[in-house]
Amino acid sequence: MNNVFEIINQARRKNKLKRELQDNQKKIRDNQKRVTLLENMLDYIHPTMTTAEVIAVVENMKADYEDRVDDHIIKSAEISKSRRDISRKIRELTEADKKANK
């Protein structure tokens, strides 16, 4: 019976990680769009139109967004690994419970 509770607990944890992964993927997508936007801005902003400081600010913003995308990609990989580990543990617990009930 303890395995049943553990299986339920692990399944809930796995579902929570799935939701977190989806949220993280949305953040990746949003930040990639921002990077694209800033790249386009850099194509249109020239020193003759504005000061070089504006370009430096835009480049810094772009670098910040790229760093965020990288951070979210790493976090997604970590979450995916946790989900796989939980799935493996659920499978092992289920098999052990089946053997114990035979």
Swiss-Prot record:
Parts forming coiled coils: 7-34
GO cellular component, one term: cytosol
Domain of life: Bacteria
Pfam annotation, one family: DUF496
Localization (cell): Cytoplasm
Keywords, ordered alphabetically: Coiled coil, Cytoplasm
Major location category of this protein: cytoplasm
Task performed by this protein: Pole-localizer protein involved in the regulation of several cellular processes.
Family: Belongs to the pole-localizer TmaR family.
Alphabetized NCBIfam families for the sequence: PRK05423.1
Name of the protein in question: Pole-localizer protein TmaR
Phylogenetic classification of the source organism: Bacteria, Pseudomonadati, Pseudomonadota, Gammaproteobacteria, Vibrionales
